[in-house]
Amino acid sequence: MKNLVAPSILAADFANLQRDIEMVNNSNADWFHIDIMDGVFVPNISFGMPVLKAIAKHAKKTIDVHLMIVDPDRYINTFANLGANILTVHYEACTHLHRTIQAIKTSGMQAGVAVNPHTPIAVLEDIITDLDIVCLMSVNPGFGGQSFIENTYKKTNQLKHLIEFTKSGCKIEIDGGVTNKNANALIEAGANVLVAGSYVFGAKNPTETIADLKNSIG
């Protein structure tokens, strides 16, 4: 399975958003990772539909939307209509997770589930074969620029074994604190998609940083 890099738009310069979108378009990155936060499920508020619509208008790569919100079912069709290709919801935010996953797929998007750092992988056993992607939070969700949680390597490996055992075929995405210092170890543990925010957009040369990260993971 190809290893992918997904710059997180949460870390972009919102006064120069189109510039940063074009940078990602012209880089070696594979996806746009877009965090939607409601100030309820997580303490922070990021951005909503108008910003996503503007991003989708210019983005030329896969749009990977990560919902950190309560009751995500309310907006599934809206995100599909706005151009999201992948929609990931949090295990901790869904009352009827299987129904939510089926609704995402019915709307034409790939379906993902995110789990917080201290949520065990075992909660995914009954749903893993329905998923296209699992997003492991390697920081506590809600803010960019946090330090990487070391237990992520163990969880990634556990998830890899679950996917292999069930023949699910879904991707493993790591979100939070990803840099060139931990990228290879994450891929070796079983990850396929690395989300990088502050590491990319805080760099002097984001395009070069993406290229280096992409080259390092093959």
Where are these regions (language model features)?
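Short acidic loop-to-helix transition motifs that present clustered carboxylates
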Residues: 118-120, 179
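Acidic, Mg2+-coordinating phosphoryl-transfer loop and its flanking beta/alpha structural elements
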Residues: 191-196, 201-202
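Conserved N-terminal beta1-alpha1 strand-loop-helix module at the mouth
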Residues: 1-88, 92-96, 103-106, 111, ...
